[in-house]
Amino acid sequence: MALPNQQTVDYPSFKLVIVGDGGTGKTTFVKRHLTGEFEKKYEPTIGVEVHPLDFFTNCGKIRFYCWDTAGQEKFGGLRDGYYIHGQCAIIMFDVTARLTYKNVPTWHRDLCRVCENIPIVLCGNKVDVKNRQVKAKQVTFHRKKNLQYYEISAKSNYNFEKPFLYLARKLAGDANLHFVESPALAPPEVQIDIALQQRHENEILEAANQPLPDDDDDAFE
């Protein structure tokens, strides 16, 4: 969904809402996509920046109109106007800040209240930072709600495309859809320890085979 003053395109486009606590890296994540950053539009009535992010797939070009809150969530909840007509979503938390993960269920509830049945990706950001507070095996909310989960690092571009590819496949109803060209991304600002991150990714896979805990995602040791 484009804004009233924004050009529409003749290829599939979708409104993608990105939510999560302030400071989790939502804006940093969206700004990695250089053409989207260059063409963004500010909508003052809702207080949102909309970044048009184009991706090239084997079925043609698609666009996500990424709605970024511009930090309003720090002043209370987001207005329904932010969510209305949302066709897909990313919920982001910061793996170095436990509270941002504990608040994920609230963001999910707000999202589903307005948008109901849309594909949602949960993203744990800042996996490049060493002092991780939310361990990979502690992330279970996505399993309870049947969401996709990815560990990402916006500043290093690690896994940048994965949330978009998952959403594109769901929206197109085509599990074989794939990107044929990478978008132009800002150069990495940090490096990620790939070996360490691979261990975390393995933990996620192992945890997926374990029974779900009975807690409400807030029992951190």
UniProtKB/Swiss-Prot annotation:
Assembly behavior: Found in a nuclear export complex with RanGTP, exportin and pre-miRNA.
Subcellular location: Nucleus
GO CC terms of this entry: cytoplasm; nucleus
Keywords: GTP-binding, Nucleotide-binding, Nucleus, Protein transport, Transport
Spans annotated as Switch-II: 71-87
Biological role stated in the UniProt entry: GTP-binding protein involved in nucleocytoplasmic transport. Required for the import of protein into the nucleus and also for RNA export. Involved in chromatin condensation and control of cell cycle.
Top-rank lineage group of the source organism: Eukaryota
Alphabetical list of PANTHER family matching this protein: GTP-BINDING NUCLEAR PROTEIN RAN-3, RAN GTPASE
CDD domains (alphabetical): Ran
UniProt-listed GO biological process terms: protein import into nucleus; ribosomal subunit export from nucleus
Protein name: GTP-binding nuclear protein Ran/TC4
Chain spans, region Switch-I: 40-48
GO MF entry, a single one: GTP binding
